[in-house]
Amino acid sequence: MVASRAIGSLSRFSAFRILRSRGCICRSFTTSSALLTRTHINYGVKGDVAVIRINSPNSKVNTLNKEVQSEFIEVMNEIWANDQIRSAVLISSKPGCFVAGADINMLSSCTTPQEATRISQEGQRMFEKLEKSPKPVVAAISGSCLGGGLELAIACQYRIATKDRKTVLGVPEVLLGILPGAGGTQRLPKMVGVPAAFDMMLTGRNIRADRAKKMGLVDQLVEPLGPGIKSPEERTIEYLEEVAVNFAKGLADRKVSAKQSKGLVEKLTTYAMTVPFVRQQVYKTVEEKVKKQTKGLYPAPLKIIDAVKAGLEQGSDAGYLAESQKFGELALTKESKALMGLYNGQVLCKKNKFGAPQKNVQQLAILGAGLMGAGIAQVSVDKGLKTLLKDTTVTGLGRGQQQVFKGLNDKVKKKALTSFERDSIFSNLIGQLDYKGFEKADMVIEAVFEDLGVKHKVLKEVESVTPEHCIFASNTSALPINQIAAVSKRPEKVIGMHYFSPVDKMQLLEIITTDKTSKDTTASAVAVGLRQGKVIIVVKDGPGFYTTRCLAPMMSEVMRILQEGVDPKKLDALTTGFGFPVGAATLADEVGVDVAQHVAEDLGKAFGERFGGGSVELLKQMVSKGFLGRKSGKGFYIYQEGSKNKSLNSEMDNILANLRLPAKPEVSSDEDVQYRVITRFVNEAVLCLQEGILATPAEGDIGAVFGLGFPPCLGGPFRFVDLYGAQKVVDRLRKYESAYGTQFTPCQLLLDHANNSSKKFYQ
């Protein structure tokens, strides 16, 4: 439930942000004199209802920190002491955000588990007071209500939410290696039932407002309003507030009840959970599933189960104590530090550090309607970008357009889009076989065959029909951008935009700049990527850039291990057991054996012995037999269309036997196999930083995890070196270097860190 979702899920949550304070004044209410001194929370009174507004200054989202906590307690004490106020509404002034969670930096500053435990206990006490409020409080939710934000909402007596796409509720703490620490593990099971609460807390998934209503997480929904004199968002917030105020009055007058009637299924589930045997079976089943999926690499899920069990079996006091103690324990684990580091890295990689481009890209064009081209088209039209999709054949173009439509239609099936919205989005796409309309293109992304001659040909054609300001971006995964730009008349407008497959699911976009690429071109490429919803790293040009360059030596070692006689299934088990979401042999099949051969040959020429390991002949023979991986139905495994099951390809036995290499017993234990794979990757990543291919360790970690599936629990290659220890990494490399040679020679920057224990990639 967690490890398999950790890569894809982290980016959905903006649960934590650093807050900077500045005063704000709430106007259209009767206000208290204390209002002028508050910066995050203010309130006014409508009749006998206090309307509490959350509005953290200088931030797009509201988050919970010590200042917010102090102001909230102050406001609630004033409301409780005021006899003229009989109820309250809690609402956000920010469009698209109720409260997005707690400030992650509060935990980063903790040096002991006890400090983190105190943070949890302070939150528990605050929300306990709210839960026991003598005056009913209605949470009016519009936008993200996550983590501590949801814990705040469920401590209120009533919850109303807008029924729109931006309103989501969830507890994503597990994706940061911690647990809901302000009462969430105790209140959620009582509110939505134990099974649903476990699902929310163990996956970190977002719940849409309509689903939340069915679960009992929300009591009432408010339909969003359309445009008027004010914007739809402003009108909807005003309407939400009006409805919430009326309900608060009704609760105070006892004309409406805060209790929601349960359906038959909910009643049966609630009754079943009163039986001790049933509860024990639920715990056992959930624990077994967690252990299977996390492989023991993520401690938070089991701690969540323990906290819930403590509350259900020993009472609320024991439950809250267990929650706060386990929160403290988790906050200082290596896994939590790794996952929080990834979150912070994502925040950095979702900003355009190159500034606003001189001209926004309004018309995009894509060359090649294959898997990648169609994928790029889908994520572009989905965000409102007018897109031309060009291919050389009617069949290819039709297949690409159908892929885009299917991707959008899948969202309709999941109720993420309506049919009308799908058709409206799809109308942004125009398919064609010629360059008609390219004279208006602001950017062209080529996704044609990985051949330098082909790319030169299309670049010349594009420059002959596009305006001077048009940017030419290549989706190549390995060909140096300066070689592609060699035939360009405007090399300052040429850049690399390396997407990952499947484009609509993989979050990373690797942007590659040459010495001639202008800053404005880079700013435009980043702006387009951000609009497409991507997490972006910007790297310097060179063979393999960053991601392919790190993957290649690792896969070379994988081939060597297979040639030494390790079974593909065992190798997959060893690598997933170390934290990779996809096993190494399966990864080769997914990438494509022909692609792996092409990259191995090209980068082998560029980097020589350092990229040694397995024999490229293994890949060549597989390609000659048609064993290209999943796309051909056969690789190291045999794949059945429409089935997730796969079996070993017995025809590989002869190929591997003929290319067998002697195993070296001193470096062939299961642990050594795991570290041979990981250290090849890590050493190359650090070398990329040393050579200036990477600008920052954070971008290196984000690229490795979100583009290549580096174990999230390790936080990326640079975080891994900091947490595991540079000296221990170097010791491993030296051990393997003595057995295999220079491909394991540690780079100088890694040696520098090993020689100085105070030297860290993250200070």
From Swiss-Prot:
Keywords: Acetylation, Fatty acid metabolism, Lipid metabolism, Lyase, Membrane, Methylation, Mitochondrion, Mitochondrion inner membrane, Multifunctional enzyme, NAD, Oxidoreductase, Phosphoprotein, Transferase, Transit peptide
Annotated protein name in UniProt: Trifunctional enzyme subunit alpha, mitochondrial
Pfam families in alphabetical order: 3HCDH, 3HCDH_N, ECH_1
List of residues that carry Phosphoserine: 231, 316, 419, 647, 650
N6-succinyllysine, modified sites: 46, 60, 166, 213-214, 230, 249, 303, 326, 334, 350, 406, 411, 415, 436, 440, 460, 505, 519, 569, 620, 634, 644, 646, 664, 728, 759
Pathway: Lipid metabolism; fatty acid beta-oxidation
Positions where Omega-N-methylarginine occurs in the chain: 399
Residue positions, PTM Phosphothreonine: 395
Highest taxon listed in the record's lineage: Eukaryota
Modified residues (N6-acetyllysine): 46, 60, 129, 166, 214, 249, 289, 295, 303, 326, 334, 350, 353, 406, 411, 436, 460, 505, 519, 540, 569, 644, 664, 728, 735, 759
Gene giving rise to this polypeptide: Hadha
Residues under site feature: Important for hydroxyacyl-coenzyme A dehydrogenase activity: 498
Site, as annotated: Important for long-chain enoyl-CoA hydratase activity: 151, 173
PANTHER family registered for this protein in UniProt: TRIFUNCTIONAL ENZYME SUBUNIT ALPHA, TRIFUNCTIONAL ENZYME SUBUNIT ALPHA, MITOCHONDRIAL
Chain's role: Mitochondrial trifunctional enzyme catalyzes the last three of the four reactions of the mitochondrial beta-oxidation pathway. The mitochondrial beta-oxidation pathway is the major energy-producing process in tissues and is performed through four consecutive reactions breaking down fatty acids into acetyl-CoA. Among the enzymes involved in this pathway, the trifunctional enzyme exhibits specificity for long-chain fatty acids.
